[in-house]
Every structure is written in structure tokens, then in C-alpha cells.
């Protein structure tokens, strides 16, 4: 499969130079994708970044979608709709792509049509080394391909038509959209499709501390339910009331951490965040999923 059949979609929020570096690296690949679509939720870039992005958009190197109201699944859905290629490759906005990233995704789809391809994510703490093949939990950083049941949202590709047939990503996953990938993977597998981990499709994730989902803060040091709501919504949506035991276990685990042992004053604040997240998840569950083309059903 030609790499020109691949549309790269990059949801981005609050990122400046690292976003420009990411796009520049993709444009410089010897076998680049057919297009790069930026689903940009940033309210305002600095003047220099704005000038570069506008130049790319005007010159046709990049399609620059300006979106309001930050939402990871909504940005991904808008990128999915805008993509022209039959294969859509979603990437984080703070990465360094391997030279054969797009080629590896294209080859995987040629070898296994119709599957979702989960790429390898080399994180800063890996220090350039792969994980052992038997590492638990699986961290998408081994050297052997395998069938998997989930994927990481910063490096995966799938057939556009198949994703649209499922309604895209559930926009009920708010704020940091925690577990939105797991919920989509659940629906993908339930529909009879498969997920394949492909280690040759490699990115170096820079994990820049500013911007992106980290704008909403860290889950250990906030009383906001930005992480908890996604965890509870995922459990209840995929398991219904059978998900209640796992929800109760999460409530206990949320305060059974070294952070809370050393800073016990965070325990009541964390419990407030968790309970708020659980109630919010119940409300979202009652309202029904928000898929592409269906609104709130």
C-alpha cells in the first residue's frame, strides 16, 4: 500500500514549537503520508507559530482545522471526517516519528486489511530500550507483533470507513478523555474486527509537560473529576451494572497510593473528585453516547 493512502490526523491543544517540530518531521519523511490534518483546539498560538501554520495551510502541506471547546474525541472525529485517505493514522502532537512510521502502518494494512494497527510508543523513561516480551501490563514497546485488545491514542491507524461505521469516538469522554481508547477498542472488537500491534510503526513520544491533556492537571493533585469521570463512564458503559464492583475498587485504589500515604490531607479531596466523577459518569450514561452523526442518542 502506498503511503499516500494514509491520512495523518493530529489532534492538538496548547502546543507551540513541539507541534511545529512534529509536523516538520512528518513532512520530511522520505515516504510521507498523503496528507496531514491538524485538528487544532488551541485558542491562540503565538505569532510565529500562527505564521508557520497558516503558511503550511495556504501552501497545501497541511490542512489546518480550527476547532473550539477542547475535546480529544471531538477533535479526532472532526479529523476522521476531514481525512481524504482510506487509512487514517492518529498521532500525538509531541512526537518524533521513526523514518518508516507511515510505511509500517501502510504495510500492516496491506497485510491485514480491515484491522486496527496499534503502533509502538517509545517513552522518555524507556531510554531507547524495548520492554521484555512478557512484561505485564503490556506497554506497546516490545519488538514482536501480536494481537492486542486495546491501543494507545497517540499512534494507531485504522480504515476510515470502518471507524465511521462505528460512529467514531464517543464524545462523552470529557476533559482528559481517560479510557476513550479502551471504549472504542471494545466496540471495535465487539463488531468482529481485530487489533494488531505493529512494532515497526514506531514513534518517540516526547511527553512535553505543557499543553495537551496535561492542561487539565494531574489526577493525584486535584479535586476535579477530569480523570475519574472517564474511568467510571467506561466501566459502566461497557459492563453496565456489572461494572459497579470495579467502580468501587477504583474508589479504594484512588487513595491507596504512596502520594496519599505521604500527604493524607489529599485523601478527602481525592474522594470528592472520585464521587463527582462517578455521578457525572452516571449522568453521561443516562444521556447516551455521542457518536458521529447521531448526536445524543
Q: What do these predicted ranges mean?
A:
Residues 73, 123-124, 141-161:
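A recurrent flexible, glycine/aromatic-enriched loop bordering the glycosyltransferase active site
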Residues 25, 40-51, 95:
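A conserved acidic beta->alpha catalytic loop
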Residues 156-158, 162-167, 174-202:
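A short, conserved alpha-helix in the catalytic core of glycosyltransferases
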Residues 24-33:
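Short, acidic, metal-binding catalytic loop of nucleotide-sugar glycosyltransferases
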Residues 221-226, 239-297:
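Non-catalytic, C-terminal membrane-associated alpha-helical segments of glycosyltransferases
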Amino acid at each position: 500500500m502506498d503511503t499516500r493512502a494514509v491520512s495523518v490526523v493530529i489532534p492538538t491543544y496548547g502546543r507551540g514549537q513541539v507541534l511545529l517540530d512534529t509536523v516538520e518531521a512528518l513532512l520530511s519523511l522520505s515516504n510521507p503520508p498523503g496528507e496531514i490534518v491538524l485538528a487544532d483546539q488551541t485558542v491562540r498560538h503565538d505569532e510565529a507559530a500562527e505564521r508557520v501554520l497558516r503558511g503550511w495551510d495556504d501552501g497545501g502541506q497541511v490542512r489546518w482545522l480550527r476547532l473550539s471547546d477542547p475535546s480529544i474525541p471531538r477533535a479526532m472525529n472532526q479529523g476522521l471526517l476531514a481525512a481524504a485517505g482510506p487509512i487514517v493514522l492518529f498521532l500525538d502532537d509531541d512526537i518524533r516519528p521513526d523514518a518508516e512510521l507511515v510505511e509500517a502502518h501502510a504495510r500492516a494494512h496491506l497485510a491485514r486489511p480491515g484491522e486496527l494497527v496499534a503502533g509502538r510508543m517509545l517513552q522518555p523513561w524507556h531510554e531507547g530500550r524495548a520492554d521484555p516480551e512478557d512484561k505485564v501490563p503490556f506497554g506497546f514497546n516490545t519488538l514482536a507483533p501480536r494481537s492486542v485488545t486495546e491501543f494507545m491514542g497517540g499512534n494507531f491507524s485504522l480504515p476510515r470507513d470502518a471507524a465511521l461505521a462505528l460512529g467514531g469516538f464517543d464524545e462523552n469522554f470529557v476533559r482528559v478523555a481517560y479510557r476513550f481508547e479502551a471504549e472504542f477498542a471494545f466496540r471495535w472488537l465487539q463488531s468482529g474486527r481485530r487489533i494488531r500491534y505493529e512494532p515497526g510503526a514506531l514513534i518517540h513520544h516526547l511527553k512535553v509537560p505543557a499543553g495537551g491533556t496535561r492542561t487539565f492537571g494531574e489526577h493525584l493533585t486535584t479535586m476535579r473529576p477530569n480523570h475519574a469521570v472517564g474511568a467510571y463512564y467506561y466501566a459502566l458503559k461497557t459492563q453496565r451494572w456489572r461494572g459497579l464492583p470495579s467502580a468501587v475498587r477504583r474508589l479504594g485504589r484512588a487513595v491507596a497510593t504512596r502520594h496519599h500515604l505521604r500527604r493524607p490531607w489529599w485523601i478527602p479531596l481525592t474522594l470528592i473528585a472520585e464521587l463527582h466523577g462517578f455521578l457525572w459518569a452516571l449522568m453521561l450514561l443516562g444521556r447516551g453516547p455521542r457518536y458521529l452523526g447521531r448526536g445524543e442518542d
